[in-house]
Amino acid sequence: MTTRNHVTALDEPFPHPSALSSATKTHTQSNFRIATRKLPISKAGPIDDLTARIGIPVPEMIFGDNLVAVSHIPTGWTLEFNAPDALDAVDKTDKHVLKVAYARDWESTREGTTKGIKEVVKPYDWSYSTTYDGTLRPGKLSAEEAALKATTEKQIPIELLKRRDPILFFDEVVLYESELDDNGISIYSAKLRVHEKRMLLLCRLFLRLDNVIVRIRDTRVYVDFETNEVIREYTAKEAPFQDVHYVSWRPSFCFD
């Protein structure tokens, strides 16, 4: 069963928090509920609040109310992907800062965009290369039980996912995006598909820093609706920019 009630008109008023459910699309399959929400770019107030909370400037395009969530209905266990938590997992030191010719100028332009940080902006990974792999909400389970349901030594059954089973539910959601002051692109997005017996969710951090590096960090979540089993897999790959002939940020379901 699928319900759809997206806010789609460009001039439609931004919903009050109490009305966020009206912009949420859900699908129930067996014991699981899958939810996605897509709303316009966050406004100044929420951006200032988030900047103060996480301690770094946020990207130019942040969709703070967007989310993707997979919930086990009997227990309330949920694995959720949202922009605030994804940005909070960005490195807030200078240990992994990538350098480009205009990095200092770019940082200076971001300092004045928020009211949440009064002092000079602290060092941080301005490429927004988050290590985020989702937010766990245990529901009725203990923290240990919840973690075990999302992390396992078992691998995602690739062969089953290659089958051309009918797709019952599909969606794509962007959580944040930055053009890095015309030095490339950094984007965190999610893409999911649901079949009768299983589903796959791919959340991807894609970074292209022109003439420097290409980086991909993927979190794949596989759900078996017959066994109630959830497998989460995190992978990270990167290569020098000149070694990559063609790159696209768009998530795919390939397992190369």
Where are these regions (language model features)?
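Amphipathic, interaction-prone secondary-structure segments
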Residues: 45-85, 181, 187-200, 204
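Anionic, Ser/Thr-rich low-complexity intrinsically disordered regions
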Residues: 4-52, 97-120, 125-127, 145-170
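Hydrophobic alpha-helical membrane-spanning segments
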Residues: 6-22, 32, 76-80, 86, ...
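A eukaryote-biased signal for long
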Residues: 123-256
